[in-house]
Amino acid sequence: IYSLDSNGNVNVWLDDSGFANGLSIDSNNNIWIAHHCGRVSHTTPSGENNIVTSTYNGKKLNSPNDIAIRKDGSIWFTDPMYGIALEGFGCEMRDEEQPVRGIYQIKNGEVTLKTGSVEIPNGIAFSNDEKFLYVANSADGVVYRFEVDGEELINKRPWVKIESGMKPHPMFGYIADGMQVDKNGNVYVSGGHEGFAIFSPDGKQLELIQPDAGSSESPMAGFVSNLAIGGPNNDQLMVSVGNQLVIYDIK
């Protein structure tokens, strides 16, 4: 895991990340990490790493992918199968032990399955008022929206899909990957080789942006996998594009 400071300096923050994927920072500046090979951990500001969970109901998790944190401090994560089902993620190939590819909550040290109704759950994000939870389904490229009723998810419905006219990725199909919500409630959805799309809170696609893939000949060149919002005023969008980080100003 790398860090990027305000002066543009890039440093190794965690040398052996255990095949980390999605990251999120809680109110105590702990960095929560979803690990492809089947666990969720957090690292304290002092650098101490703690495995929080690797099982549910006595069975191994599949391949935790992305994380969202509610204002109450609870951790929500998706658990598809990528790390244990596809070569190249660094994990040992194994069968899925969980009966569903779930969306889980960690609260007060307890892990709870909230839903297993999304075929391949990937990116995850709450609306600013936390009335809704958005979950990207990489099986069909659709972002689903759940209503949040206390601790439960209800009224799932297909919300948006990136409209680009591009052909599906040969391995992953139509991708909906990592997501972020800005201060205006707009939802940013990464879409693999389709770039990333910006949707208004009412689900209208405002823009589709396809970053420059650079000179790399890798099959992942130009592949947008995740996003983060940061900067001094939370007015910058950081986008992971293949092996590059591209930064946009949010207007």
Predicted feature descriptions by range:
Residues 1-12, 36:
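Beta-propeller domains
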Residues 16-37, 57-75, 97-102, 113-132, ...:
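Beta-rich, blade/repeat-based domains predominating
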Residues 77-97:
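Short, conserved, GDST-rich strand-edge loop motifs in beta-rich repeat architectures
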